[in-house]
């Protein structure tokens, strides 16, 4: 049985009759204070809401045919669950973005156990990554799929963190350019090299792979330099897709982000280093897509909030329901802030200040002759 704790001294209370509204009173045996604790239904309602959100249940099967459920849980759709500031240093973090529609992307950062941060943007760019990463302490290693603007943000926010590009994304990018059945010798050899990239386990194997890639570039340099006329009469590279694959691999080899997971000093510091982004792709993004698929038909705003709720529940130390309702912003509070800013802009726009008012002499001319019709 759950005990009632005294709010004054923290000791266990005993039953002490009932008040006029027939609510149970409780007496503390130590400090003799009497209190009537209120039943907190918000926690129960939030648990019901989250249980529905994270399951395959539909609202029609909820009590009251869904109407009672929607009425009791509508308040939770108004909340924007924002990420906390992470001051604890982590050895490895994973970052990625998930697109919810054409102009809505949620950037997510996690470690092996929890979601550390999330940020809503229209598309992946440097400022969005900076906003996400600036709330998290710099880790020893970050694994990413090479999203747009991430390298710039990494240099600015986490300048000392080492970067490992997800090898599976690198392989997938090459496969997209060469296809799984290349029709040229150069394409077949490059595709075979890309497949081997996923199975390198030592530094010597990685160095050998780089040498073979450089040999491939020298061997097919003349073939890749071929140019031809397109339908508009312009000269273009004949094997443009192969050139894109070659340039992407060359850039990664030059940056030194392909084989960070084989760095012996880093392994000695943090242990085994991951080479792929599977932790966030399979552990978080896949579950978020399943959530949105189970509740398909949600508006874009509710899709975003559903992702925010999932990330918040899986964050390291989520707040209690009472604290969450007090701290987290809502649609109403955000609208009030924008309205206040809008009213301030209107006030400064329409109230004349020094140098803004109309000067009478600029619109009227004075002379020695009398002018009675002005």
Model-based region annotation:
Residues 52-63:
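Short, charged amphipathic recognition helices of the HTH superfamily
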Residues 15-25:
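Short linker/helix segments within small regulatory modules
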Residues 145-148, 152-194:
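Conserved beta-strand -> loop -> alpha-helix junction used to position metal-binding or nucleic-acid-contacting
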Residues 13-14, 36:
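Short functional micro-motifs and their immediate structural scaffolds
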Residues 25, 30-32, 36-48, 141-147, ...:
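Acidic/histidine-rich catalytic cores and adjacent linkers
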Residues 23, 27, 33-34, 64-160:
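RNase H-like nuclease fold core
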């Amino acid at each position: 049985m759950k005990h009632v704790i005294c709010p004054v001294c923290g000791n266990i209370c005993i039953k002490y009759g009932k008040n006029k509204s027939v609510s149970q009173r409780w007496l503390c045996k130590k400090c003799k204070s009497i209190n009537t604790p209120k039943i907190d239904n918000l926690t129960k309602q939030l648990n019901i809401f989250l249980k529905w959100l994270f399951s395959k249940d539909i609202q029609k099967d909820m009590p009251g045919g869904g109407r009672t459920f929607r009425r009791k849980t509508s308040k939770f759709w108004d909340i924007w669950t924002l990420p906390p500031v992470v001051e604890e240093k982590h050895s490895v973090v994973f970052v990625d973005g998930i697109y919810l529609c054409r102009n809505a992307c949620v950037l997510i950062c996690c470690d092996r156990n929890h979601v550390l941060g999330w940020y809503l943007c229209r598309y992946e760019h440097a400022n969005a990554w900076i906003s996400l990463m600036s709330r998290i302490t710099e880790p020893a290693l970050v694994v990413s799929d090479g999203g747009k603007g991430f390298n710039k943000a990494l240099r600015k926010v986490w300048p000392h963190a080492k970067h490992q590009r997800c090898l599976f994304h690198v392989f997938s990018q090459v496969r997209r350019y060469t296809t799984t059945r290349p029709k040229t010798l150069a394409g077949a050899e490059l595709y075979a090299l890309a497949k081997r990239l996923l199975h390198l386990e030592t530094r010597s194997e990685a160095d050998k792979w780089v040498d073979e890639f450089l040999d491939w570039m020298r061997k097919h340099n003349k073939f890749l330099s071929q140019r031809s006329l397109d339908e508009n009469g312009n000269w273009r590279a004949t094997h443009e897709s192969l050139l894109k694959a070659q340039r992407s691999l060359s850039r990664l080899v030059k940056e030194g982000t392909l084989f960070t997971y084989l760095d012996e000093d880093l392994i000695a510091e943090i242990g085994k280093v991951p080479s792929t982004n599977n932790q966030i792709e399979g552990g978080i993004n896949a579950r978020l897509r399943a959530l949105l698929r189970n509740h398909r038909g949600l508006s874009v705003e509710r899709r975003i909030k559903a992702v925010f709720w999932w990330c918040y529940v899986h964050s390291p130390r989520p707040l209690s329901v009472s604290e969450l309702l007090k701290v987290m912003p809502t649609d109403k509070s955000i609208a009030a802030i924008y309205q206040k800013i809008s009213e301030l802009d209107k006030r400064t726009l329409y109230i004349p200040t020094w140098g803004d008012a109309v000067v009478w002499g600029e619109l009227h001319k004075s002379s020695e002759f009398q002018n009675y019709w002005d």
